[in-house]
Amino acid sequence: QEGETLAVVGESGCGKSTLGQTLLNLHGATDGSVQFRGDELTGLSDREMRPYRRRMQMIFQDPLASLNPRQTVGDIVTAPMEVHDIGEDAEDRLERAEALLERVGLEAAHVDRYPTQFSGGQQQRVGVARALAVEPELIVADEPVSALDVSVQAQILELLEELQAEFGLSLLFITHDLSVVHQVADRVAVMYLGEIVETGPVREMFNDPEHPYTKSLLSAVPRIDPSARQDRIILEGTVPSPIDPPEGCRFHTRCPAVIPNDAWTGSQQAFRHAFTFRNRVEAGELDPDAVRTRLEAELGETDDDTVADRLIENALPGDLSDLPEAATEPIRTAAQQVAAGDEDDATGTVQEAFPSPCVAEAPRTVKPAPNRTAACHRVDPEHDADAEF
């Protein structure tokens, strides 16, 4: 929305930077729509995008890599003005550049210096000045402080806040640091594997997150107030490939609140453990040959049953005895199938034994509260999921 800061947060590789660059048409959108003040930007050529380039600018994550080392700072800041016919002549543009440098905390005399002559924080200030040179309405800031020292980060964040108020900017702030989000943003959008899973006002999201992924991210934020601290939610497993994401809910392979099937008689934690075993079998993470080699080194000889027992020990969080009796047999069967080299049969066994609506169906985006959205079966009234998590 006009004049607000929307933060986009998520783990590295989830698509935050690609999203920001796609909004500016630096990457072509493969699906969906990108609109700016009601105008459709998807599919526009570079020539057609030119009027929008002046209104939409970007601050990059690596300040030095985004600045031409062969150009002076004056040339870097005045180049966008020249492209968009801002300023009466070269002298006027240089004066504007000097004023911008002073506004971002540098000196007018710095126009004659080169980017390599500045510190990281100063280089980022040059990047901010360049983005402001064309008087944009929207700035996409792609992790603008992640490459800087903590003390310098605070200075750049404060500068962006001041400039936003002064120039009436809208800011899309991309970051993986939730402590930064709390400081600069009005609203936040949480991204996982290329999809927005939750949005809402920052204060409400921090106080009462809806999506399990958001809860896990917030549990990792250090808190000075002991009463505000909470138990860390550790996500098991690795992040799937965004090229081949899981079916259903993309978070189900790591979700601590994955929904059991109706026939499940154990606890949520027990199902999470059984489901983790299922995921590891499906992903081919069980290595019977390595286990067999180790057992032979330890015992001198081994058999498939012993290998299967060790596979269960390695791949199942907790103890097999903690699961309902009906769950132990398919786990033993799957482990024996893996030990015998029948990985496809093992995958079918665990898929049949431990189904979940989180796998069968992608969650729809619902509004659990005013100004809030979440894409999770647990907050969808159409799903009768026990909110134990």
Segment roles from a protein language model:
Residues 144, 148, 152-230:
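P-loop NTP-binding/switch modules centered on Walker-like glycine-rich loops
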Residues 113-118, 122:
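Conserved ABC ATPase signature
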Residues 32-40:
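Conserved ABC transporter NBD signature motif
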Residues 41-57, 83, 90, 205-209, ...:
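ABC ATPase NBD coupling module
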Residues 202-375, 382-385:
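Charged, flexible cofactor/metal-binding loops and thiol motifs
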